[in-house]
Amino acid sequence: MTDLAIIWTNGRGDIAQDGIDMLTDDSLTTDVTISLFTDRRALDSDTLPDGSDDRRGWWGDSYRDRPIGSRLWLLSREKATPDTLERARGYAEEALEWLKTAGRVSAINVRAEQLHQGWLYLYIALTLPDGSVIPYEFKAAFNGV
């Protein structure tokens, strides 16, 4: 499926352009970026980072079997502890699982690290059905995940 191409630069997603034209993309890159960095609705059991009752999410998920996005935003006020990094890894895997269910990939491998103070690094390897592997690296500020 072709979507607007999303690029990840300086810790933020943006629509890819060529001059004044918006570019399209049918690779996994846009799917992965949207899956990771769109706010998925928090579960009732999740603790919300700002203490509000705003569980975020996309209203269209009310009509879908599979919600869009990830719960990485729940980590926005967390300190980078081993537990937080494990949650980040789990949230990323959860967000990307639909690629496996849809047959777009056969395996998903996610690693979460903090290499610099206040930054979350996600290393993702997606194995395609033909066995080839596509690597992705994302960097996001913990105060803006």
UniProtKB/Swiss-Prot annotation:
<keyword id="KW-1227">Viral tail protein</keyword>
<dbReference type="GO" id="GO:0098003">
    <property type="term" value="P:viral tail assembly"/>
</dbReference>
<protein>
    <recommendedName>
        <fullName>Baseplate protein gp46</fullName>
    </recommendedName>
</protein>
<keyword id="KW-0426">Late protein</keyword>
<dbReference type="GO" id="GO:0030430">
    <property type="term" value="C:host cell cytoplasm"/>
</dbReference>
<keyword id="KW-0946">Virion</keyword>
<comment type="subunit">
    <text>Part of a complex composed of three DNA circularization protein N, three baseplate hub protein gp44 and three sub-complex wedge (made of two copies of each baseplate protein gp46, gp47 and gp48) that forms the baseplate.</text>
</comment>
<dbReference type="GO" id="GO:0098025">
    <property type="term" value="C:virus tail, baseplate"/>
</dbReference>
<comment type="function">
    <text>Component of the baseplate. Probable connector between the central and peripheral parts of the baseplate. Probably involved in tail assembly.</text>
</comment>
<keyword id="KW-1188">Viral release from host cell</keyword>
<dbReference type="InterPro" id="IPR010877">
    <property type="entry name" value="Phage_Mu_Gp46"/>
</dbReference>
<keyword id="KW-1035">Host cytoplasm</keyword>
<dbReference type="Pfam" id="PF07409">
    <property type="entry name" value="GP46"/>
</dbReference>
<keyword id="KW-1226">Viral baseplate protein</keyword>
<keyword id="KW-1245">Viral tail assembly</keyword>
